[in-house]
Structure formats: C-alpha cells, structure tokens
Amino acid sequence: MEDVLAEKLSRVCKFDLPFIPCSIPFECHPDFTRISKDTDAWALRMLSITDPYERKKALQGRHSLYSPMIIPRGESSKAELSSKHTWTMFVLDDIAENFSEQEGKKAIDILLEVAEGSYVLSEKEKEKHPSHAMFEEVMSSFRSLMDPPLFARYMNCLRNYLDSVVEEASLRIAKSIPSLEKYRLLRRETSFMEADGGIMCEFCMDLKLHKSVVESPDFVAFVKAVIDHVVLVNDLLSFRHELKIKCFHNYLCVIFCHSPDNTSFQETVDKVCEMIQEAEAEILQLQQKLIKLGEETGDKDLVEYATWYPCVASGNLRWSYVTGRYHGLDNPLLNGEPFQGTWFLHPEATLILPLGSKCGNHPFITI
C-alpha cells in the first residue's frame, strides 16, 4: 500500500497552502526569552552538541520555544521545566521513529522505570543515551513537584505514547497505511499532546482539577479537540519534511491514500484545512461550556484551564510556521509570521511563492 502511495506522491511537486485562520488568542509566556535561552543551553550541554551544523539544527528547530508558545501562563520555573520536557520528547521521538518492535519494547521498559524512579541510569548509560539522561532529570523534577494525581495521569499518557510509538513503527516497517480513524486514534497518542499541552498547562499554572472533571465527557472531548487541531496543523506544515524522509504516516498521506483515484492532492490539502477549522470550532464550543460549568460550580481552576488550554492550539500553529524542523535551516521565510501561497516541495527548504505561481527563477527551486 505504501509503495502505491509513494508512486502517487511522486507526481506531486507543489500545492496551494491557504491562510489558516485562528480566532484563539496567541501569546508567549512573559519569560519566554530567558526560558528558551536557558533550555537550549541545557539541551546542548546534555546532548554534547558542539558541531556547528548540529548546533544550528538544534537551535533553529525552536524546540525550547514550543512550551512557552503554547502555555502562556504559569510559574517561570515550572514553565522552564516544561520546556526541558518538550525538548527531551522531541529527541526521544526522533529516535523512536527508527525502533524495531523489539527495540521499542526494551526502550519502553527502561523509560517507564526511569520515569517512576525505580531505575537509575549508570554513568555509562547516560553517556551512551544522553536523551535518557535528559529524561531522567526532568522526571525526577516532575516526581518532586507534581501532585500525585497529576503525575499518575502523566504516567498514563506516557505509557499510551510509548505503546503507540512502537505500534506506529511496526506499521511503518510493514509499509502499511492505517485507515483514517485508526490513524486519528494513533496520532492523538503519538503526539503526546495530552501531556505536553494539557497536563503541562495544569502543572505550570498550578491548577487542581477534580477527577470527576477530568473524566467528564465534555472535558475529555475538549482535550481531544485541541490535540486534533495540533496534529492536523503539524501534519500539514511538516509535510515537506515528512515527504523528504519518506514518512507516510501523516494526515495528508492517509487521506490521499484512501481517497478515490480521481482525488487531487490539492483536494486533500483543502480537506485537512477544513478539518483544522472544524477542530477549532469544537474547541471554542466546548471552551464556553466548561467556563460556564466552572462559573456555576465555583470551580475557578476549571475556568482558568478552559480559558488558557486552547492557547495550545494557537501557539502550536504559530510555532509550526517558525521551526526549522519543518522548513529547513537559514530559511528567510521564517520571519515569525504565518505564510500562505503556492508551496513548492523542495527537499531542503519550504519555498512559498504567491498563489498560482510557477517555479520561475526562485534561487532555491530546482524542481
């Protein structure tokens, strides 16, 4: 199935990317500059990155900015820890993409024990797997700073994430493209956004949500709607990079694969953009319901959560426009603002020209 999809995609050299509106407010954490600088310094030190190219690649990925861009409120020290956590998970996620099923299961056992504090890495292990050392340091802080119920929820998310990453890796090895519904469920877990977004929002803002609230249907749907918005945006704006590395587990690829043969790739792009808007509408609807519930029951923490959690979606959207992880290094397009236009699928960088453009004389285009 993957080979057939790859052949269809080989004929796609460009598509039109429309403006993606978002009515959810966007703002960074007030201390984002310091948090980003300190987190980057920590990650470079932990990973022993000294090579100039690898350093540039790490810094232009903007990993340290992700958490301050999606969680604009909260205690600075906790926001920095959340940023370190996100940096760590980016590294672990990249490594996990190449796991065999056996390697994945072994890594799951180690990481879960490290997270629980029942296994301490040796110096030799830290040297061999610096990402595990990063993870161990962050988890130690979480265990001491998170309330036990919140940490228990985090651990549940972690187990689901690790299991889903291994499952997805096995599908990729088998060159199997899942159904849209299967992919939706799998992607919610492999994104790890319930933890990176929802739980970190509670943690940074020191919110105490009752078990009956977090298990209520509206709250669960609210969390999922934000996750869906995040992964749809990420799959759309990372498509060039995913195509380059031949990773076909992506909303665009899955929808295109299972669409009728006469469906154009542009129709697939338009469908994903439509799904992003549907997710935003659901977020806003559920936000109002939960704010109203919080006000009626006197649950101030629920009101705070419902007010700020949607910023995960708007912050992720903005971050997805500025990361070199998706768009290539030293790309002048990444000026902090959203972009739209005809996207030429150059392997090294995102290239956008006004809608309807042909390749022309753009200095990067060799298609």
From Swiss-Prot:
List the ranges annotated as motif DDXXE motif.
Answer: 93-97
EC no.? 4.2.3.137
Asked if the Swiss-Prot or TrEMBL record annotates the protein with the keyword Transcription regulation, the reply is no
Q: What induces it?
A: Not regulated by alamethicin treatment.
Give GO terms for biological process.
terpenoid biosynthetic process
Q: Which cofactor does it need?
A: Mg(2+); Mn(2+)
Q: Which GO terms describe its molecular function?
A: metal ion binding; terpene synthase activity
- Kindly list the positions annotated as binding Mg(2+) 3: N234, S238
Q: Pfam families, per this entry?
A: Terpene_syn_C_2 (PF19086)
Q: Where is the signal peptide?
A: none
Task: Name the positions where Mg(2+) 1 binds.
Answer: D93
**Catalytic activity entry:** (2E,6E)-farnesyl diphosphate = (E)-2-epi-beta-caryophyllene + diphosphate
Keywords (A to Z) from UniProt: Lyase, Magnesium, Metal-binding
Question: Its pathway?
Answer: Secondary metabolite biosynthesis; terpenoid biosynthesis
Binding of Mg(2+) 2 occurs at D93
Q: How cofactor binds (record note)?
A: Binds 3 Mg(2+) or Mn(2+) ions per subunit.
Q: Would I find Iron among this entry's keywords?
A: no
As for family, the record states: Belongs to the terpene synthase family.
The extra comment attached to this record reads:
Selaginella moellendorffii contains two distinct types of functional terpene synthases (TPS) genes, the typical seed plants TPS genes (SmTPSs) and a microbial type TPS genes (SmMTPSLs).
Q: What does the UniProt function comment say about this protein?
A: Sesquiterpene synthase converting farnesyl diphosphate to (E)-2-epi-beta-caryophyllene as the major product, and to two other unidentified sesquiterpenes. Has no diterpene synthase activity.
Task: Present the record's domain note.
Answer: The Asp-Asp-Xaa-Xaa-Asp/Glu (DDXXD/E) motif is important for the catalytic activity, presumably through binding to Mg(2+).
Name the UniProt record assigns to this protein: (E)-2-epi-beta-caryophyllene synthase
Organism, as annotated: Selaginella moellendorffii
